[in-house]
A protein has these predicted regions:
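Short Gly/Pro-enriched turn/cap motifs at secondary-structure boundaries
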Residues: 28-31, 55-58, 70, 95-102
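A short core secondary-structure module
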Residues: 50-90
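Glycine-rich beta->alpha junctions and the first turn(s) of the following alpha-helix
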Residues: 88-169
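Short glycine/proline-enriched turns and hinge-like loops at secondary-structure junctions
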Residues: 32-34, 45, 58-62, 99-101, ...
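A short, Trp-centered hydrophobic/proline-enriched beta-strand micro-motif
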Residues: 16-24
Length: 169
């Protein structure tokens, strides 16, 4: 972000006084962000944002969202503030996993974004993808940890279980 964007958001985010989220995934695209449908069109000094994002961690409690959208120039990042007219975040309930994580769908209906809320110097997929490798490591480590715990529980159970007066394992 610009120095002004960093000054406005980073201190409050670091103190936990504000919450942010990262909006890249779309319901039809999943892990293929190059198939992005969310788009922004220049309108004077502002941008008009339309589309939606899905499975966004902290989306319904975020004060600011980094949202990636297709423009005539390519993909750009926009800072969408929760009180902007036309922005709506809906929490997703009854998930199969990650139930302790607040997850939401984000909707943009002619959201007017000032040029001061556009991430500078980033056009194309390099911006959003530069963040994803580290995030994906975190997800994979969690899955590996859960799988390891399941294996250990199964082994412990099979070592303790007795059927027909004989140990199962």
């Amino acid at each position: 972000g610009s120095d002004e964007q960093k000054d406005k958001w980073l201190p409050q985010l670091a103190k936990g006084k504000k919450v942010g989220c990262f909006g890249l995934t779309e319901s039809h695209g999943g892990s293929d962000p190059t198939n992005m449908k969310t788009h922004a069109k220049k309108d004077g000094d502002d941008w008009i944002l339309n589309g939606s994002k899905m499975w966004i961690t902290n989306g319904s409690i975020a004060d600011v969202c980094v949202v990636w959208a297709m423009t005539d120039e390519g993909v750009k990042g926009f800072l969408v503030e929760k009180e902007m007219p036309g922005f709506n975040a809906q929490e997703i309930h009854n998930k199969f996993s990650l139930r302790a994580s607040v997850t939401a769908a984000l909707f943009f209906d002619n959201v007017r974004i000032p040029s001061s809320n556009v991430l500078p110097g980033i056009v194309g997929m390099k911006g959003p993808l530069s963040c994803l490798s580290q995030a994906r490591y975190g997800i994979s480590w969690g899955v590996i940890g859960a799988a390891q715990a399941c294996l250990e529980e199964a082994l412990n159970y099979s070592n303790e279980r007795v059927l027909f007066n004989k140990p199962v394992s």
